Amino acid sequence: MPCVQAQYGSSPQGASPASQGYSYHSSGEYSSDFLTPEFVKFSMDLTNTEITATTSLPSFSTFMDNYSTGYDVKPPCLYQMPLSGQQSSIKVEDIQMHNYQQHSHLPPQSEEMMPHSGSVYYKPSSPPTPTTPGFQVQHSPMWDDPGSLHNFHQNYVATTHMIEQRKTPVSRLSLFSFKQSPPGTPVSSCQMRFDGPLHVPMNPEPAGSHHVVDGQTFAVPNPIRKPASMGFPGLQIGHASQLLDTQVPSPPSRGSPSNEGLCAVCGDNAACQHYGVRTCEGCKGFFKRTVQKNAKYVCLANKNCPVDKRRRNRCQYCRFQKCLAVGMVKEVVRTDSLKGRRGRLPSKPKSPQEPSPPSPPVSLISALVRAHVDSNPAMTSLDYSRFQANPDYQMSGDDTQHIQQFYDLLTGSMEIIRGWAEKIPGFADLPKADQDLLFESAFLELFVLRLAYRSNPVEGKLIFCNGVVLHRLQCVRGFGEWIDSIVEFSSNLQNMNIDISAFSCIAALAMVTERHWLKEPKRVEELQNKIVNCLKDHVTFNNGGLNRPNYLSKLLGKLPELRTLCTQGLQRIFYLKLEDLVPPPAIIDKLFLDTLPF
């Protein structure tokens, strides 16, 4: 491929780089004794390896073919600039040209320039007769313009300083950069920048622009340049790693919630299930640490703190209770003997020891917890429309309204508790007559037990099954003295800090127990034993029996207290029937008659 090789003559003896000049003749030719012999070799060889480049500059002959130093066409084009140190080579070719623009104020393209797709070929021009330039030292950084003569001055001291700093090899593909100035910039100047790795940007610049070479500025005014005939897009030849950075797409982000579920506790992204429930890694770790350390938390509010992704760390008590409420099973958390041994059995003990109790039936306790959670109102959807913190119960309304409210609360809870009973494993397998008998006999006990576990006796706040919230004083005229016994039982129950798994077992045992007139009492007894064993294993595996002696006995001791409270409730219904201010609903009347002990 034909190319152009620059052949520079030496400067006159004693000429310095700071005193070189150009002279422009009327014929359009340039004359130059450009550099000292030391600088003649500075023709783009930055290290000892040759740098070959096929120029892609437009109409190179327009700028250079009339210099006093001749240009000959030789294949291939070789520019050499010796520099102390090692050598490296760079080959710039096949640079695609874009945005070719022919300016109307320039003469048409001559046949000396023959563009090619990717490279530019030049027709050889006749070498002009060398002329002897007049050397004149210029201390001004700008060019003088005396008519048709243009004296060129550059501060090559900075260039020499730059050469001394370029003694390390220059990496390939990092020497040239071709840029395009911002839109609207006049296209009357050409910029060459040698900054670090050699960059040769061919940009249109404003008039009188300054060129920086390692911190030194060279001012080149407009009169020395010919107007550019082509506009170039920004072409950047950089390191290969830089090119790859713009071509290789970034990997897709991990943890996208598109194909993942949500944590049942806080609503964060959850990839899989932990301890029986789909939860996030944060709630899984919190639940595991709490169970392994047998941590006890205290709620500083009303035990109904919101637990979501943003506020899950505010109240540990409410977060742990929600973990239990959604069905996370403490029995499946690894104990000390299995901690950190994913899927491996503990090492065989050296001395014989008592066999550990079998793990509780996870399916049974999980089903009991799930049934309890599904039958309780959500703390975020409670009905406070009728709640009054300090009501004047003696003046608000008459007895008829309070008695009707009492009956409505009982009947509204009955359907919810019946739905809870049908979800207990094994209960639906009993005869229908036994199911009805067990439910009707234990309804008032379950009503009191569930009400006492949900309510806040310290504030006198009662939360019923249908989500209605009332103050204790609002229930006195309807419930009578029974409400005081319920609040006292609630206070004692919550002082025991019963977790939701143990409470679910106690609630099931309150219904699945021995009753008169059962058709298949043996099957009821078997189901009762399963629930008792489940509760016993739960207490044992959670170290409740070690830290709190007779804890299981205290839990089971709440069942006789419920029988007493149930009797008080029957007495209240009997009193209201005798008062006959409001007739009881048929279902309450049947319940009262079926549960009479005589």
Curated annotation (Swiss-Prot):
A cellular-component GO term for this protein: nucleoplasm
Gene3D superfamilies reported for this sequence: Erythroid Transcription Factor GATA-1, subunit A, Retinoid X Receptor
Superkingdom of the source species: Eukaryota
This protein's encoding gene: NR4A2
Positions of the NR LBD domain: 360-595
SMART domains: HOLI, ZnF_C4
Subunit structure: Interacts with SFPQ, NCOR2, SIN3A and HADC1. The interaction with NCOR2 increases in the absence of PITX3. Interacts with PER2.
Source organism: Pongo abelii
Motif Bipartite nuclear localization signal (NLS1): positions: 287-314
UniProt cross-references to Pfam families, sorted A to Z: Hormone_recep, zf-C4
Biased composition (Pro residues): 352-361
DNA-binding region(s) from the entry: 260-335
Location in or out of the cell: Cytoplasm; Nucleus
Motif (nuclear export sequence (NES1)): 443-452
UniProt main location, coarse: cytoplasm
Keywords assigned: Cytoplasm, DNA-binding, Metal-binding, Nucleus, Receptor, Transcription, Transcription regulation, Zinc, Zinc-finger
Protein name: Nuclear receptor subfamily 4 group A member 2
Short motif nuclear export sequence (NES2), span: 568-577
One annotated GO molecular function: zinc ion binding
Entry keyword annotation includes Transmembrane helix: no
Written domain comment of the UniProt record: The ligand-binding domain (LBD) contains no cavity as a result of the tight packing of side chains from several bulky hydrophobic residues in the region normally occupied by ligands. NR4A2 lacks a 'classical' binding site for coactivators.
Tagged with keyword Nucleus: yes
Motif Nuclear localization signal (NLS1): chain residues: 338-350
Family, as annotated: Belongs to the nuclear hormone receptor family.
NR C4-type ZnF: 263-283, 299-318
Region (Disordered): 1-22, 337-361
